[in-house]
Amino acid sequence: MAYGSVGLTTAGGALIVLFYLIMALTSLTREETRLAIERMAELHVPVPALVFWIGLALQFGGIALLLTGWHADVGVCLLIFATVTASAIFHRFWTMQDAFRRAVSRRMLLHNMAIVGGLLLLLQYVR
């Protein structure tokens, strides 16, 4: 399979990094931090505050490695791990009774699957 130019790959990688940067910075707001930790506690995640901060550290670490190009492949893997883990925690749509919440959660899981797909494509270029 032939892939696009280096410019397209760079643009795609930049959009992925921008997405994660915006999400991570948003998670640092007091309200978002509180909501995420409370939701994890409701979902019976052990030590939810610690899990939250580890997840955020993985995101910022992955972003930094991609931006600097130093072990960028490890950075992509950190973002994949963080995304899959967050999806497993927050988007268990099959357990939800409310039809609207179930539909939204299913879509979010599918969005995250697509993002992981983009990260896997990016991984081949940063190795």
Per-range role (PLM):
Residues E38-E42:
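Short amphipathic alpha-helical coupling elements at transmembrane boundaries
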Residues M1-L35, P46-G61, L67-R127:
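Extended, low-polarity transmembrane helix blocks
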